[in-house]
């Protein structure tokens, strides 16, 4: 990407923004809904009743979309913390006895939209998927695979893995047409770069084949669910690049939601990315990451310089 300007950095930045909105982002010239994301409000510890209350208060404030973050996955390994459940993508009926369908109905009743968090590229050791397919995980032979955030990385160079992820997301979105927003998370890097799928002479292809598998999944989902907004989240802005963003509408700028620190992040990112691409949320004071207190007006001012949301 090259921008030319005779009038300094500001004009070059605005030219990149115009290009990005037209060509570099999905839906770059469409309006974004304001949203309430559940994460910092409840983390993993929520019930259906608690979520209904959050949705009601969001609707009363005029917020247009409610996003259920991590903690909704169930099955044999319910996800009540970060150590279990990733990869299984079944609803935790102990927390949500009426399933996602019940939450979607409640959102529709309140006149707001519904979104969901997923992390399809990851798997916990405590999951049905890992127990059935340990060979689907990226790792080096004859070495203990290293956990990060209690999870392993699935091998997207393997077409069977990509097919599993695609089928799981099709089931989630196709079975719940009321889902209008997906927060696609990715909370760890490749730390043990070996593929059980690739031949020895092709091990160096892993990073490229991984990205190609990821792109094929997102391209397919975008074609099959064109009205669903996709956010790229990677422990914050780990995927804030134009190679990724033409498959996503926006990115989560940082897991650090301190408004003061976000000023500098958003200023820097704003040189290359338009405001519509940066998710920025009003969060609690004191802030959960830094402990810093800030006025509600200041937190709003900072969040409104991106795509406005709330936690």
PLM region spans:
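An acidic, glycine-/histidine-flanked metal-binding catalytic module
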Residues: 13
